[in-house]
Structures are given as structure tokens and as C-alpha cells.
Amino acid sequence: MKTDLNMELMKNIADLYYNSNLTQSEIAHRYNISRPKVSRLLADARENGIVKIFIDGRNEISRFQEEQLLKRFPLKAVKVISVPHDDDQLALQITAQETARFFSGFFRPHDRIGISWGYTLYTMARYFPELSLDDISLYQIIGHIDNTSTRNHASEIIDLMGQRLHTQNAFIFPCPAVFDSPLILEMLLHDSKVKKLYESMLQCNKLIVSLAPSDTSCCLYRSGYINYSDLDLMNQCGSVGSICCHFIDQKGKLCDEGLDQRTLAIPLDVLREKEYLFAYVTSSEKVPVLYSA
């Protein structure tokens, strides 16, 4: 009996092979698996009727958009999902379900996975499929901002993902996301336990990041870490939004060095060096920062 994960992988590979005309070697490289495994999955797809069902039901517009994005940007993979435009909650649910299945196909044994927080990622974590992979570790890559008026679901995301991946190696940062001064943050990072956790987080090979627009809807504003004047100043500097609490402009450069020096999060330069960086958006407000990140 095929698992949901294998069924989804067969669908994706069948689509790339039969509809996008990729070779088995190209597909193997994209998914970091062997070419014989691709061949076996294609055979399984035929035997299970996946090829017929998937090709007949696939949204042609979404597939065209995916191929255009892959041609234009240096992406390993992309998935475009059709959602209703008149129901934001349903759109988020559909996107989160598809994203969870899509992202899970890239996880491997011994991965060290860093994950951000926020309601969008929390929704994805709720739908994440169960995987049995050896020696998986999870790390929160931004400090907390939970208070009485704002929740970022950081602990819940780590707990849910730890359950789905069957690992007890799941670690949170029990510290604020933003401090009053860089000196306080520097002193905290000298604590042996915090330092060890921070250094382990830096070694993550795959990151699931959060994106936010540069407006009053972002968590840092709603939780009181930054005010309207801070937002206004960053927007004057060309801010298009934030990735893991780093506010950037259209060229991907930091907009507020002072704020960044007080922020407990995986550094922007480290983030960009990772081989795998996962993100998903469900609203047009986050597209500018996705483009610039």
C-alpha cells in the first residue's frame, strides 16, 4: 500500500516526465534521488493509475506558471496552487495542505531543519505528513514574540513538526526575538546553553522561512517590538517586507541595521548560503519580499 507521501511524489515526477518533458536524470537531480528510483516511481505511477488521473486533472495554467518561474529564477522546484479568491481562510488551508506535502518530499535522513514561526507556517505544520527519517533535528530560527495580544505559534510549530517527523531532537529559543540593545543580545549569546543552541541552529542545512509585509500586519509591529515610526522609516528606505524578521529592500539589502543587530534570528547572510530554503505565500502582500529575498 502506497503512503500519501509516495503517491504525491509519483504525481510530481509523472507530471515532470510526461507533461514537462524532463529526462529521468533531470528529475533525479531535482529531487536528489537516483535515476533508477525515478524509473521505479514512474512504473508505479502507471500501475496505480497516477499518470492518467494526474495528467487529466492537472491545472494547465498552474503548470505553465511553474515552468515560467523555474526559467526566470534560480529555483530547485516550485508549485503553483489554484485557490478561491473570495475566501482567504480556505485559500490558506488549501495552500498549507499542498505545501506540506510538497516540502516533505525534500526531507532526507540526517537533515537539520530550521523553521520560523507564524500562523501561515503553523497551518502548514498541522497538515504535515508523518515521515520516518533517521536522525532528524528541528530548530527554531527566530526568538519568541508571544504575548497577550499576539501569538506566533513558535512552540506549537516545533511540537507538531517533531511529532510528524518522529524526532525528539526539536529545539525552541526561549528568548525574545528583539532586545532593547545589541549589548543585551550579545551577553545572552555568551550563555553556554544559548550559545550551543544558536550555533546548532546556524548549521541547519534546510530552512523553512517566514515572510511578512512591511506594514502594521507584521508580528513585530503587532507585538510592540517596533512602532509605526519604525515602519515608516523602513518604508522610506524602500522596505518591501521581512524574511525571518530581517527587513529588506527590493535589492535584498537590510533596511535597518540597528534593528537587525538587536534581533535574535538566523543571520540574513547565513540564511542565503543554505542549499535549501523553503517559503510559501498565500497573499499578494508577501510577493514583493518573496521576490527580493
What are the residue ranges of the model-derived segments?
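ATP/nucleoside-binding phosphotransfer catalytic cores, i.e., glycine-rich phosphate-binding loops
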Residues: 256-293
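Ligand-binding beta-strand-loop-alpha-helix segment within the catalytic cores
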Residues: 67, 72-109, 133-217, 222-228, ...
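Key DNA-contacting residues within the recognition helix of helix-turn-helix
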Residues: 39-41
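Short alpha-helical "recognition helix" segments of helix-turn-helix
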Residues: 13, 23-33
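Short, amphipathic alpha-helical "recognition" segments used to contact nucleic acids or chromatin
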Residues: 5-21
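Alpha-helical DNA-recognition elements
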Residues: 44
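Short Lys/Arg-enriched helix C-cap and helix-to-coil transition segments
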Residues: 50-65
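Gly/Ser/Thr-rich loops at beta-strand to alpha-helix junctions
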Residues: 113-123, 213-215, 283-286
